[in-house]
Amino acid sequence: MALSRLLSTLKSKVLYDDLSEESQKRVDNKNRKSLALSKRPLNQGRVTIDQAATMLGLEPFSFSDVKVNKYDMFIAKQDYSVKAHRKATFNILVDPYWFHQPLTHYPFFRVETFAMVWIGIKGRASGITTLRIIDKSYVNPSDQVEVEVRYPISKNFAVLGSLANFLALEDKHNLQVSVSVDDSSVQNCVISRTLWFWGIERTDLPVSMKTNDTVMFEFEPLEDKAINHLSSFSNFTTNVVQKAVGGAFTSKSFPELDTEKEFGVVKQPKKIPITKKSKSEVSVIM
């Protein structure tokens, strides 16, 4: 009997259940997302906010406590509104009363971290937002430090970065930020209120900053609508900024798979390469 069972086993064939068309689409989509994730610029994938802070040299700094390392960093918040097809341009606020200690005690500074949190946004807006930061302290445009981030409109958006060059107090008006929204579905105000969160390193001496040390992390659009609730603002840095920046690392949004347009960090300071991804690179050949 044992021999007959063995012979029947040897003659048997393994049956394969072909994936349905819907199941195959899910598998293909999962593979495309995994490949796109591995090819994200600069960080080659996701890292935690603690890892990002370490890579940026911000280990003592925490979004949850503005008093941490307060003698080296200061934090300010600005708010403004953005209209469709118009560029909202503003300068960083560096007035002494904004910070723990007068900025005149630290005449040199550089932007270390920045996060943008959209509080009020038209829910059905479907445009593209471009965020641009440029240091116009230099006469030669090729020497200017410029960063540009582009993403589809979402409830919230956060960016963590580090600009290499220091700025003097006299140059405070040369650091310009512009936000523009390209959206044909909205005629007027798209974002009714935005909070701009700065973390800036201060020093008594003009420390030499190498441009090729600049690191920029692109953060995904956030889908958590609860972050816009007024109750979240009882403790801004803990409940809003930290949640926005930390949650962005775990987001699963892949806008580059849905359109031919280029999203993410599309312009870096010079000497910082950006990995260009073609449509074929993010598609998996089965």
Swiss-Prot record:
The keyword Transport applies. The keyword Acyltransferase does not apply. GO terms for biological process: transport of virus in host, cell to cell. Keywords: Host cytoplasm, Host-virus interaction, RNA-binding, Transport, Viral movement protein. It is found in: Host cytoplasm. Its main location: host cell. It comes from the Viruses. Pfam families: Tenui_NS4. GO terms for molecular function: RNA binding. Transports viral genome to neighboring plant cells directly through plasmosdesmata, without any budding. The movement protein allows efficient cell to cell propagation, by bypassing the host cell wall barrier. This is Movement protein. The lineage of its organism: Viruses, Riboviria, Orthornavirae, Negarnaviricota, Polyploviricotina.
